[in-house]
UniProtKB/Swiss-Prot annotation:
Component of the chromatin remodeling INO80 complex; three different complex modules assemble on different domains of INO80. Interacts with DDB1. Interacts with transcriptional repressor protein YY1; the interaction recruits the INO80 complex to YY1 target genes. Interacts with YY1AP1. Interacts with tubulin alpha. (Microbial infection) Interacts with Epstein Barr virus (EBV) lytic switch protein BZLF1; this interaction participates to the activation of early lytic viral genes by BZLF1. ATPase component of the chromatin remodeling INO80 complex which is involved in transcriptional regulation, DNA replication and DNA repair. Binds DNA. As part of the INO80 complex, remodels chromatin by shifting nucleosomes. Regulates transcription upon recruitment by YY1 to YY1-activated genes, where it acts as an essential coactivator. Involved in UV-damage excision DNA repair. The contribution to DNA double-strand break repair appears to be largely indirect through transcriptional regulation. Involved in DNA replication. It catalyses: ATP + H2O = ADP + phosphate + H(+). This is Chromatin-remodeling ATPase INO80. The gene is INO80. It comes from Homo sapiens. Belongs to the SNF2/RAD54 helicase family. GO terms for molecular function: actin binding; alpha-tubulin binding; ATP binding; ATP hydrolysis activity; ATP-dependent activity, acting on DNA; ATP-dependent chromatin remodeler activity; DNA binding; histone binding. Its main location: cytoplasm. Residues 1390-1408 have a biased composition (Polar residues). PANTHER family: CHROMATIN-REMODELING ATPASE INO80, HELICASE SRCAP-RELATED. Activated upon binding to double stranded DNA or nucleosomes. The lineage of its organism: Eukaryota, Metazoa, Chordata, Craniata, Vertebrata.
Length: 1556
């Protein structure tokens, strides 16, 4: 390069060209451009940006030598530098790049390296320095200087040392001076994402005032630095430019100003550049070139090594293929033999399993056929029910069309419901065989025509019967009129039923013979009933209770008599409780009607029946017009009622006809009557049977020729078909639509606004302690497991279980109502025993007893007693000089004299009693004296006083202390007048704030029944008799206490009170008694206990709440109806009414009909009767009790409609007061759940418009169990039961797993023993071949090879299971390898292996090269990637005893696999054949998801009977292989003797052994 530059400067003189290889080398190693760019970047001066012309500034630094070579050499970098500096000074964008990056881009990159987000004015100079290129130039310059290793002058060394000392000085100063610590993180904070400089400064300096002072100090320091810099500049004129430049850089570090623009940059000389270049070349030659050469050599050696390894592996594979080909030729015959043996085993197992499985499959097919027949019968019954409903709908449509004069637009829609849209059904049975059930022959058009014909015939028959009845009635009436005209008592009115005067839609006025004013809705109801009568249609008047159904019926009969001249006979049938009400209403509103009350005893009814003459009926002068009777009497006297042709039959409370199988329903249906009217306050029943019953009753013509529906409900087909819900939802709604034209229902809130309001209040009562004990005792006897088991039983068991459970429910309800219902408290007395007296002889009495009443002896005993007063005196005050101790020395310190001591011990019980009283009295004074009266100076005395030995007073629990301290009074058993048994926690409830609080350690008194406890046995004390007069006297004195005064003190407390006690009856204010008479019990001294009436109230929470409620209601002037379901409870309520002196009346099922009328009338007319006790069933129907304004349900009924009827006895027309209904409910008991169920029942009634009688016996066992158990308790028990069941299943699973392991181990052991025997006998075992990677499924001749499989099942997640003892398919496993079982769970995870291109398979074009449906390239080989033999094993060791063992294991596993495949195939074939034998159409095109996928025809070859899908359970344990004998996918074998490849290609489906 130097030569070229020199030639260019000499004026273009030519030089010889260098050799070509030198030019290539120079061109490859040319670094001119790189060096220029590097020098421009690193040699640029810091102040180059401030200079105007970089080129001019750089020229003076060039050496002054006039060598043009040096100038030319230095010119390019200087010009480049000048261009760079010029561009920088002009403020334009840099046009050159620094290492390929623009200068503006480098500044942006530098800005990204620092955090300038919180940078303020004081640190702006750091930003300019960090973003400028000066630091890089200085660093590059310093690096160049270091590389050049220039020798430092003495002055430069001194400067460096001075700067180092200066630096250390300021570092020490910074560390000591706390004010300088504010500059911590001054520049280091810019390198972090979070700049802590200002936070540190604020922490050290505090407020801003201090900062201002610091800034002033800083400015002063900066002035000093500037002055010092000026002095250095003056001195620098004598120093070298290098030192000056170094100092400016140093001062720039301590100041905010850049170095002055006058400084010049020093440039290197040519010699220095050449030396640096030579140094770089030496480094390249010495270091880089040898390193590159070594890397190339190592790479070549590695390549050669890999090539050798690859060649070795290729050689080994080719050798293995050759060996394998030779081995295949030898093993062809043994393989064929083994194949034949396995096929024989396969068919043997096939036939065995087929026979066994066929029997089981035939049994299953028979059961399936029975089930299909049952389903078909259920479907037929359902179609029959649909046919009957459709037929009834058509009949109702004809009737309503006639009545409403409508058009025939709904007929086709009704008939369309007979169409059957069911399709052919397929069922997957256990074996996976698809069964096609044959379609039944159902012609919807035929049934449509049949239903239409039946409905039209029934309609015409009904019309004909109506006309016939009218004609007969006309003739009977004419005959009666002729007879009356002859006698002159009749009238000449003519009437024709054929031409009625009333037309549909005409408004009918109120009859004039009706005394009263009908309301608007009642008049509409009468018009509707009259219209039904004209058309000959029966109807149901289902107005809500209390709206006047009775009045509307009477008005209809009055209308017929007045407008149509039909005076009967009319038959009214009602419950026994409303008979008198009907009689009263007829007498009140239509007095012209002659009403015949048909009830009483048989003799009375016989007398009444004398007026039943057909000749005298049908006229106004008939002996009777209306007959009123009850349902019971109709059934009893049915033969008499059937003789009369009734014009109108009215059935009150028609819900009694809910069952079509009842005798009452059948009898009433046989009556001869023109029209029937059903009155019911409850809606239509909510079961299909009850709806059918009502339909049949109001439309008997339609069902006279049909008996199917009776059989339908007797067999309970709905539950048997198990589709009851569908029938209920669809057909139940259709039945309601059928009844709609014949039913009229209004409710109170829609038609009547004059009725007062009705308020219902739930009163929750707490159980008493006695009730809780009984309730819990009953609950403890219940076995929840038995309940759950009984509730889950069959339908036959449900009926028996429900009755027993309902009995249990009634016991709980009894306890809730009153414990007396469950266990009545009777009068109780102990067992009294009279002991025989003991007879004592006179001699024994006189001489045998120690103490007798002998006064002379007693006197001497008192004189000689040690307690004699003179003896005590002598012992205390003995003579002087005798120092004897006395046993009575303590008397002087307890304040008792010798005489008092003698009286206490010798004068008897009375004296001791008096002494005890005086001592207790004195103890009070002594206690007060010791507590309050002791002076301070006498607190320490020397001698004892006369009361110092009375220490009992000082005891904390002494009687005076207990009486004076209120805390000690409350101690247990510290007082004789309190029955405190302990301290316990009490919950205090506050009614106003509805809160409760717990108070601990409160006094707990003994229960009252413990205080009046009576002994079980009592007896008079044993008495003795003696044949001695003195003995009797002494016995009498002893019984009286020794003296009369003692007796008086014991009984009366004092002798003075005895006279007052005897004269107490004559005194107006007698003195209170004392002694034993004052503590006489309330019930006397006798132990006989008679339960009080107060306990009758307090023992029941409900009765206690009722007592409080009745007291309040009586004071406010209300009158009350009390309903209860239990007559025994009404008996208890009667006892309560007598005890509280409430006037009451009682009506229940035992009341006579005549008495009921009088009781209702008395309650309505007499205001002094406060309470009416009624049973819910007997007193809740039909009667009018509007005099009462309060209804109390002591217990709720199962059916909410029954309670609704009962409360409507008071809330009905005529009630002017507000009616309040109270319902008593025991909290937390079975009654809450019964009430909840009743609410759900009423909600269903409102939704479906179908209410009805809810009988307890219709409850299911599960529903009764839900009443007995709480939801939480039931859930807890069920959870425990499920947990126990789960644990039991887990235990059984473990046992089953253990049993299978033992069975498998035993089987394995037997197989091993069998193999050992065969080995000893010398049986030739054929070692199976190990196929190579190239010819996996081919023999030497290209034949398909048989692949045997392991009999063990694979992992459920594995795709391939490869055993070390059985190498399947094309897995190239080394015989000497010790690898064990390999399970590949994900074939996609293994990398595909490349195959050799020179394999025989690829040459011959084999079609099948897969194992288990997976290509060999996708299967990881056990031996692939390893050497031909295992480590440490010599060559040629592959055929060892271990290999023989492998062959034996393979043979056994292959046989077991064949047997298993044959068994499964036989089972599949047996199942298909068995179902086909019972008439099922078995489809051969079975989907892949079927569990058993096999053809039903026995195959002629091996490829015809195998499974056809990889997902079949009959496939191989290698789950996708299907490698079993007979698989058409893998057993594409031909004879081993046919080497032709054409035969191999066309050999699919052929049998090498010629079939079986």
């Amino acid at each position: 390069m130097a030569s070229e530059l020199g030639a260019r400067d000499d004026g273009g003189c030519t030089e010889l060209a260098k050799p070509l290889y030198l030019q290539y080398l120079e061109r490859a190693l040319r670094l001119d451009h790189f060096l220029r760019q590097t020098s421009a970047i690193f040699n640029r001066n810091i102040s180059s940006d401030d200079s105007e012309d970089g080129l001019d500034d750089s020229n003076p630094l060039l050496p002054q030598s006039g060598d043009p070579l040096i100038q030319v050499k230095e010119e390019p970098p200087n010009s480049l530098l000048g261009e760079t500096s010029g561009a920088g000074s002009s403020g334009m964008l840099n046009t050159y790049s620094l290492n390929g990056v623009l200068q503006s881009e480098s500044k942006c990159d530098k800005g990204n390296l620092y955090n300038f987000s919180k940078l303020k004015k004081s640190r702006k100079w750091l930003k300019s320095i960090l973003l400028s290129d000066e630091s890089s130039e200085a660093d590059s310059q310093s690096e160049d200087d270091d590389e050049e290793e220039l020798n430092l002058s003495r002055e430069e060394l001194h400067n460096m040392l001075r700067l180092h000392k200066y630096k250390k000085l300021h570092q020490n100063k910074y560390s000591k001076d706390k004010e300088l610590q504010q500059y911590q993180y001054y520049s280091a904070g810019l390198l972090s994402t979070y700049d802590p400089f200002y936070e540190q400064q604020r922490h050290l300096l505090g407020p801003k005032k201090k900062k201002f002072k610091e800034e002033k100090k800083l400015k002063a320091k900066l002035k000093k630095v500037k002055k010092k810099r000026r002095r250095d500049e003056e001195l620098s004129s004598e120093e070298s430019p290098r030192r000056h430049h170094h100092q400016t850089k140093v001062f720039a570090k301590f100041s905010h100003d850049a170095p002055p623009p006058g400084t010049k940059k020093k440039h290197l000389s040519i010699e220095q550049l050449n030396a640096r270049r030579r140094k770089v070349w030496l480094s390249i030659v010495k270091k880089e070139l040898p390193k590159a050469n070594k890397q190339k050599a190592s790479a070549r050696n590695l390549f050669l090594t890999n090539s050798r390894k690859l060649a070795h592996q290729c050689m080994k594979e080719v050798r293995r293929a050759a060996l394998q080909a030779q081995k295949n030729c030898k093993e062809t015959l043994p393989r064929a033999r083994r194949l034949t043996k396995e096929m024989l085993l396969y068919w043997k197992k096939y036939e065995k399993v087929e026979k066994e499985h066929r029997k089981r499959a035939e049994k299953e097919a028979l059961e399936q056929r029975k089930l299909d027949e049952e389903m078909r019968e259920a479907k037929r019954q359902q179609r029959k029910l649909n046919f009957l409903i459709t037929q009834t709908e058509l009949y109702a449509h004809f009737m309503s069309r006639k009545r409403d004069m409508g058009h025939d637009g709904i007929q086709e829609e009704i008939l369309r419901k007979l169409e059957d849209s069911s399709t052919q059904r397929q069922i997957d049975i256990g074996g996976g065989v698809v069964v096609n059930i044959t379609q039944e022959d159902y012609d919807s058009n035929h049934f449509k025509a049949q239903a239409l014909k039946n409905a039209e015939n029934a309609y015409h028959i009904h019309q004909a019967r109506t006309r016939s009845f009218d004609e007969d009635a006309k003739e009977s009436r004419a005959a009666a009129l002729r007879a009356a005209n002859k006698s002159g008592t009749g009238f000449g009115e003519s009437y024709s039923l054929a031409n009625p005067s009333i037309r549909a839609g005409e408004d009918i006025p109120q009859p004039t013979i009706f005394n009263g004013k009908l309301k608007g809705y009642q008049l509409k109801g009468m018009n509707w009933l009259a219209n039904l009568y004209e058309q000959g249609i029966n109807g149901i008047l289902a107005d809500e209770m209390g709206l006047g159904k009775t009045v509307q019926s009477i008005a209809l009969l009055a209308h017929l008599a007045e407008r149509e001249n039909i005076w009967g006979p009319f038959l009214i049938i009602s419950p026994a409780s409303t008979l008198n009400n009907w009689h009263q209403e007829f007498t009140r509103f239509v007095p012209k009607f002659k009403v015949l009350p048909y009830w009483g005893n048989p003799h009375d009814r016989k007398v009444i029946r004398r007026f039943w003459s057909q000749k005298t009926l049908y006229t106004q002068d008939a002996p009777f017009h209306v007959v009123i009777t009850s349902y019971q009497l109709v059934v009893q006297d049915v033969k008499y009622f059937q003789r009369v042709k009734w014009q109108y039959m009215v059935l009150d409370e028609a819900q009694a006809l809910k069952s079509s199988s009842s005798v009452r329903w059948k009898i009433l249906l046989q009556f001869q009557c023109r029209n029937r009217l059903l009155l019911t306050g409850t809606p239509i029943q909510n079961t299909m049977a009850e709806l059918w019953a009502l339909l049949h009753f109001i439309m008997p013509t339609l069902f006279d020729s049909h008996e199917e529906f009776n059989e339908w409900f007797s067999k309970d087909i709905e539950s048997h078909a198990e589709n009851k819900s569908a029938i209920d939802e669809n057909q139940l709604s259709r039945l309601h639509m059928i009844l709609k034209p014949f039913m009229l229902r209004r409710i109170k809130k829609d038609v009547e606004n004059e009725l007062s309001d009705k308020i219902e209040i739930l009163m929750y009562c707490q159980l008493t302690s006695r009730q809780k004990l009984l309730y819990q005792a009953l609950k403890n006897k219940i076995s929840i497991e038995d309940l759950l088991q009984s509730s889950m039983g069959s339908t036959q068991q449900a009926q028996n279980t429900t009755s027993s459970l309902m009995n249990l429910v009634m016991q709980f309800r009894k306890v809730c109502n009153h414990p007396e219902l469950f266990e009545r408290q009777e009068t109780w007395s102990p067992f009294h025993i009279s002991l025989k007296p003991y007879h004592i002889s006179k001699f024994i009495y006189r001489h045998g007893q120690i103490r007798v009443f002998n006064h002379s002896r007693d006197r001497w005993l008192r004189v000689l007693s040690p307690f004699a007063p003179d003896y005590i005196q002598r012992s205390l005050f003995h003579r002087k000089g005798i120092n004897e101790e006395s046993c009575f020395s303590f008397l002087r310190f307890i304040d008792i004299s010798p005489a008092e001591m003698a009286n206490l011990m010798l004068q008897g019980l009375l004296a001791r009693w008096l002494a005890l009283f005086l001592s207790l009295k004195a103890s009070y004074r002594l206690h007060q004296l010791r507590s309050w009266g002791a002076p301070e100076g006498e607190s320490h005395q020397r001698y004892l006083r006369n009361k110092d030995f009375l220490l009992g007073v000082n005891f904390p629990l002494s009687f005076p202390n207990l009486c004076s301290c209120p805390l000690l009074k409350s101690l247990v058993f510290s007082s004789h007048c309190k029955a405190v048994s302990g301290y316990s926690d009490q919950v205090v409830h506050q009614r106003r704030s509805a809160t409760s609080s717990l108070r601990r350690c409160l006094l707990t008194e003994l229960p009252s029944f413990l205080c009046v406890a009576s002994p079980r046995v009592t007896a008079v004390p044993l008495d003795s008799y003696c044949n001695d007069r003195s003995a009797e006297y002494e016995r009498r004195v002893l019984k009286e206490g020794g003296s009369l005064a003692a007796k008086q003190c014991l009984l009366n407390g004092a002798p003075e009170l005895a006279a007052d006690w005897l004269n107490r009856r004559s005194q107006f204010f007698p003195e209170p008694a004392g002694g034993l008479w004052s503590i006489r019990p309330q019930n006397g001294w006798s132990f006989i206990r008679i339960p009080g009436k107060e306990s009758l109230i307090t023992d029941s929470g409900k009765l206690y709440a009722l007592d409080v409620l009745l007291t309040r209601l009586k004071s406010q002037g209300h009158r009350v109806l009390i309903y209860s379901q239990m007559t025994r409870m009404i008996d208890l309520l009667e006892e309560y009414m007598v005890y509280r002196k409430h006037t009451y009346m009682r009506l229940d099922g035992s009341s006579k009909i005549s008495e009921r009328r009088d009781m209702v009338a008395d309650f309505q007319n007499r205001n002094d009767i406060f309470v009416f006790l009624l049973s819910t069933r007997a007193g809740g129907l039909g009667i009018n009790l509007t005099a009462a304004d309060t209804v109390i349900f002591y217990d709720s009924d199962w059916n909410p409609t029954v309670d609704q009827q009962a409360m409507d006895r008071a809330h009905r027309l005529g009630q002017t007061k507000q009616v309040t209904v109270y319902r008593l409910i025991c909290k937390g008991t079975i009654e809450e759940r019964i009430l909840q169920r009743a609410k759900e029942k009423s909600e269903i009634q409102r939704m479906v418009i179908s209410g009805g009688n809810f009988k307890p016996d219709t409850l299911k066992p599960k529903e009764v169990v839900s009443l007995l158990l709480d939801d939480e308790e039931l859930e807890k028990k069920l959870r425990l039961r499920q947990e126990e069941k789960r644990q039991q299943e887990e235990t059984n699973r473990v046992k089953e797993r253990k049993r299978k392991r033992e069975k498998y181990a035993e089987k394995k052991k037997k197989e091993d023993e069998l193999d050992g025997k065969r080995r000893k006998e010398g049986v030739n075992l054929v070692i199976p071949f190990v196929p190579s990677a190239d010819n996996s499924n081919l023999s030497a001749d290209g034949d398909d090879s048989f692949i045997s499989v392991d009999s063990a099942m694979p992992s459920p997640f594995s795709e391939i299971s490869i055993s070390s003892e059985l190498h399947t398919g094309s897995i190239p496993l080394d015989e000497s390898s010790s690898d064990m079982l390999v399970i590949v769970d994900d074939p996609a995870s293994s990398a595909p292996q490349s195959r050799a291109t020179n394999s025989p398979a690829s040459i011959t074009g084999s079609v099948s090269d897969t194992v288990n449906g997976i290509s060999i390239q996708e299967m990881p080989a056990a031996g692939r990637g390893h050497s031909a033999r295992s480590r440490g094993r010599p060559k040629g060791s592959g055929s060892t005893a271990k290999g023989a063992g492998k062959g034996r294991s393979r043979k056994s596993t292959a046989g077991s696999a064949a047997a298993m495949a044959g068994a499964k195939a036989g089972a599949a074939a047996a199942s298909a054949a068995a179902y086909a034998a019972y008439g099922y159409n078995v489809s051969k095109g079975i989907s892949a998801s079927s569990p058993l996928q096999t053809s039903l025809v026995r195959p002629a070859g091996l490829a015809d009977f195998g499974p056809s899908s990889a997902s079949s359970p009959l496939s191989s344990p290698l789950s996708k292989g299907n490698n079993v004998p007979g698989n058409p996918k893998n057993l594409h074998m031909t004879s081993s003797l046919a080497p032709d490849s054409l035969v191999r290609k066309q050999g699919k489906g052929t049998n090498p052994s010629g079939g079986r």
